[in-house]
């Protein structure tokens, strides 16, 4: 069984506000242990968290070894003030504030830096994103500061501009990656970064009633086609589900994501995903 290279232990796949409330006073250790036990029972031995500001991912990291799970956490995700991500992570207004957050990640024992470079896919409107991307110059600075502190960088990036800028900045992985163009797929392959496409965040919304299938079906098809093209160009891809996102349940989403990736990658699925996860494990290494 493959690991899950993108989860949010704090989220429950149903209601993020209720999920936050369970941990607002302190991480709900009993819930975390149940989820870790379920992952272990499914044969999942590697988890990479996307961070939260309540310390849930860090607590899961501390507990995971007892379940035979290698757990990596950025402590919290970091986003631009006034942009997507503040509901879950920490914000900065200038580079000095960002440097202070990176130092805090190190002090807390975080393993890498998670940066939010864009908004979400608008599941009501094909081709539309919910926020403007970070400027390329800013992303270069953010990645450089993280690298100087000894951290690899995981970037939430939707839209061709955000992904291309993240790759140019030297990010080690890009998450989601909606609406990429051919040139950026070549850039991805040449960069050596890992793409974690989280197809199940789209696939599990189909036929659910909240968003139109007339948007979801072509969006999923586009993403699968570009996953296949990226692999053909030699890009690295890894399995990650965004577990905890709406309709994406911890544990069971791993098999669901695998099935969607297999539709795109065919008989080379295991070879491609093994290489991608190996790269994630190597580059997003635990901090001493």
Task: Please state what every model-predicted region is.
Residues 91-161, 167-169:
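Metal-dependent enolase-superfamily TIM-barrel catalytic cores that perform enediolate-based chemistry
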Residues 148, 221-288:
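His/Asp/Glu-enriched, well-ordered alpha-helical/loop segment
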């Amino acid at each position: 069984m493959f690991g899950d290279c993108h989860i949010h232990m704090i989220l429950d796949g149903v209601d993020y506000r209720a999920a936050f409330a369970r941990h607002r006073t302190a991480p709900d250790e009993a819930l975390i242990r149940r989820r870790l036990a379920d992952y272990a029972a499914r044969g999942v031995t590697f988890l990479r968290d996307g961070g939260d500001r309540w310390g849930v991912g860090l607590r899961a990291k501390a507990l995971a070894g007892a379940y035979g799970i290698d757990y990596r956490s950025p402590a919290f995700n970091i986003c631009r003030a006034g942009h997507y991500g503040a509901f879950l992570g920490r914000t900065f207004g200038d580079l000095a504030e960002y440097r202070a957050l990176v130092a805090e990640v190190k002090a807390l024992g975080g393993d890498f830096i998670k940066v939010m470079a864009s908004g979400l896919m608008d599941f009501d409107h094909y081709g539309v994103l919910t926020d403007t991307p970070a400027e390329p110059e800013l992303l270069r600075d953010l990645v450089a500061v993280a690298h100087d502190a000894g951290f690899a960088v995981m970037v939430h990036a939707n839209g061709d501009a955000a992904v291309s800028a993240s790759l140019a900045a030297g990010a080690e992985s890009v998450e989601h990656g909606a609406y990429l163009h051919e040139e950026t797929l070549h850039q991805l392959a040449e960069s050596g970064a890992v793409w974690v496409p989280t197809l199940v965040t789209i696939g599990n919304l189909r036929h659910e009633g909240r968003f139109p299938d007339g948007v979801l079906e072509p969006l999923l098809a586009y993403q699968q086609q570009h996953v296949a093209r990226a692999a053909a160009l030699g890009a690295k891809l890894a399995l990650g589900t965004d577990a905890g996102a709406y309709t994406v349940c911890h544990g069971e989403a791993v098999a669901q994501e695998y099935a969607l990736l297999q539709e795109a990658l065919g008989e080379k699925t295991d070879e491609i995903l093994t290489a991608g996860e190996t790269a994630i494990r190597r580059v997003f290494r635990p901090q001493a």
